[in-house]
Amino acid sequence: MIAGMRRLTDRLFGRGEAASTIPPFDGPLKPNQALETAPVLLTLDTAEDLATDGSHVYAAAGQSVLRLDHDQPTEIHRFGGMVTALCCLPGGSLAVAVDGREVRILGGTHDGKHWTSVANRPLNAVNALAPTADGRGLLLTDGSREHPCERWCHDLMSGGRSGRAAQLDLHADSAREIANGLKYAFGICPAGAAIWISESWAHRVITCGDGGPLLEYLPVYPSRITPAAEGGFWLTAFTARTQLVEFVLQETAYRRRMMREIEPRFWIAPKLSASETFLEPMQGAHIKTMGILKPWAPPRSYGLVIRLTTDGLAAYSLHSRADGTHHGVVAAVECNRHLYVLAKGCGKILCLPVAALEQEFMT
């Protein structure tokens, strides 16, 4: 009742969830070119996720799981569907999500175990996996009940709030929901006794249990979270928010007509990569002059990795700005003191030395 009244007053006064204002990129989120100038390790057009066991980096690419040996990928598993999420488990096993609808365990003592539903509800858009803190279970986020992983933009434009997080017990073969009713859950990670979950359409990271915000009012749509070797975490964001998109999200009749009559690639909506077509909805001299996109223009796509402390505070960030190409960052893992970043928008895996990042941004 109280929440309903709050939403009503927010819409009346244009505040809270109904506000079209965007927090600035400031402080630890101050823009830079760290991602845009990062060395490219590999180009994988179908890459979807990254994982590491501390010694090797693995990539989900199309229907395959690849091990990255320097700049040479080696296929180690292949499936009959697209791999939408991936993580390494203790004991040398892997967990993969296939087509967002099935979670499988590969190798180790739990080899062959799989799940297709949680709490009597089929899995639909599994987009992130992580081991529990004790290593006996598996955490996952199921982004949406209505839309598969590849239709994430449809979920945003439809006002989706059917995401959930779940925990799978590898020993008891059981599964339970730990959070539901989320505005597109996309990222999960244990943090001590707590569990952190990215809630993309709410622009925040929450803690499981009380569902309280850990990091909120972000100017981006957060995605996967992974641990950093020296403590803390890496949080990725697959695109940035804009006032125009926030306005469109409030205009229900316009948005529904746009979705009904216009091709999705021309929607006024976030994207994973920059567009070069003359039909794109955002043009003009304040955005592009003589074919050159200005770096301060409202971004249709963006690339961002945020370094979080153990308390969930932003320490610094790595950017590929509006005029860059390393956009649509959906995964970042640290292995052997290097940060591997997947920019899905351009299909590239970047590699940055962590020591150099710490020296540049922490001193």
Question: Model-flagged regions — what are they?
Answer:
Residues 1-363:
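Sequence-structural signature of mature extracellular/luminal beta-sheet repeat domains
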